[in-house]
């Protein structure tokens, strides 16, 4: 399939596909006329990239997953390198959640405390 069809089927723009190609994530085969040629495996690779980006992975972090698929594995998480990237991302998410819980606890504590007397703010009248 050509780049436009791949983009339509994958739900991404041709510009995005060219960007993936530029990064080496989606190497294109060329027809004799110079047109890029893709197959269903490339569609699977694009779906994997999109899924990972939606989970918060950078495009560079998707590389081990793409390489895993290219090696013939049924999923992008079937290889040790991609699983290691996944473990690191999980640790990042856990750290982020810890920070969010701290912020939440602080906000809840502030809301639960009585307002300070010098904090008398009167709302502005709106017209």
Regions found by a protein language model. Give the residues of each.
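Short glycine/proline-centered loop/turn elements that form peptide/ligand docking sites
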Residues: 6, 13-16
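Beta-hairpin "wing" of winged helix-turn-helix
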Residues: 26-33, 37
């Amino acid at each position: 399939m050509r780049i436009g069809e791949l983009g339509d089927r994958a739900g991404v723009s041709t510009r995005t596909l060219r960007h993936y190609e530029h990064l080496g994530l989606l190497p294109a085969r060329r027809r004799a006329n110079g047109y890029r040629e893709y197959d269903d495996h490339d569609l699977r690779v694009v779906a994997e990239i999109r899924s990972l980006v939606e989970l918060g992975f950078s495009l560079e972090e998707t590389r081990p997953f793409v390489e895993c698929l290219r090696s013939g594995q049924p999923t992008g998480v079937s290889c040790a390198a991609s699983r290691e990237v996944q473990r690191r991302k999980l640790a990042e998410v856990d750290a982020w959640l810890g920070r969010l819980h701290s912020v939440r606890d602080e906000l809840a504590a502030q809301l639960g405390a009585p307002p300070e007397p010098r904090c008398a703010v009167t709302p502005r009248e709106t017209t």
